[in-house]
Amino acid sequence: SLSIDVTSLPSISSSVYKNESFSTTSTISGKSIGRSEQYISPDAEAFNKYMLSKSPEDIGPSDSASNDPLTSFSIRSNAVKTNADAGVSMDSSAQSRPSSDIGYDQMDFSLNKGIKIDATVDSSISISTTSKKEKSKQENKNKYKKCYPKIEAESDSDDYVLDDSDSDDGKCKNCKYKKKYFALRLRMKQVAMQLIKDL
């Protein structure tokens, strides 16, 4: 559950105004709203100074004084005031709150069913870091390993060297370096066999 309480905000007051206030209570969509608002009339000099200090281009709809000449000015200058016994309830309808004659505008609300987080995650995910190309290469290597003959000096013959399976296009059978390759391959095999025996 998530609970938000703004009743501990500091009170900000202005010395220009007198403590004249009235409270209104209304019901919207079944939710009870209790407010104690402060519409205080400052003296005429303060309002005149405020209006005269602004250029005509800066005066907009927020500076309107059509209904109550000083309402917009007083609300904007009064900032935020908090009190524990006035507020807005968002959880229960027809909730009564005690009203106060003190000039406070306050809002506190709680969300009991607002946020629910389920932190359990089913970890049935298997991740393979081997790509398809790597898998196919490994399979091909395994196939070729099975086909290789034992390392013997006698295996150096036409059956194992430079046949169609060893060449890409099958054109190496008539290579002029074939005999030299046979001799070199036989010598390398003998060296490898000797190293294996020594180890």
From Swiss-Prot:
- Which residues are annotated with the PTM Phosphoserine? S66, S155, S157, S165, S167
UniProt keywords, alphabetically: Glycoprotein, Host cytoplasm, Magnesium, Metal-binding, Nucleotide-binding, Phosphoprotein, RNA-binding
In this chain, the stretch annotated as Interaction with VP1 covers 1-48
Q: Where does this one sit in the cell?
A: Host cytoplasm
Name one molecular function that GO assigns to this entry. magnesium ion binding
UniProt GO cellular component terms: host cell cytoplasm
One GO term (biological process) = viral genome replication
Any Pfam family the entry gives: Rota_NS26
Note down the stretches annotated as region Disordered.
52-71, 85-105
**Residues that bind Mg(2+), according to the entry?**
D91
Task: Cite the InterPro entries for this sequence.
Answer: Rotavirus_A/C_NSP5
Report biased composition (Polar residues) as residue ranges. Answer: 90-99
Q: Which cofactor does it need?
A: Mg(2+)
Write down the HAMAP family for this protein, in alphabetical order.
Answer: ROTA_NSP5
Summarize the protein's role: Plays an essential role in the viral genome replication. Participates, together with NSP2, in the formation of viral factories (viroplasms) which are large inclusions in the host cytoplasm where replication intermediates are assembled and viral RNA replication takes place. Orchestrates the recruitment of viroplasmic proteins such as capsid proteins to these factories.
- Known partners and oligomeric status: Homodimer. Interacts with VP1. Interacts with VP2. Interacts with NSP2; this interaction leads to up-regulation of NSP5 hyperphosphorylation and formation of virus factories. Interacts with NSP6.
- Record protein name field: Non-structural protein 5
Q: Which organism is it from?
A: Rotavirus A (strain RVA/Human/Japan/KUN/1980/G2P1B[4])
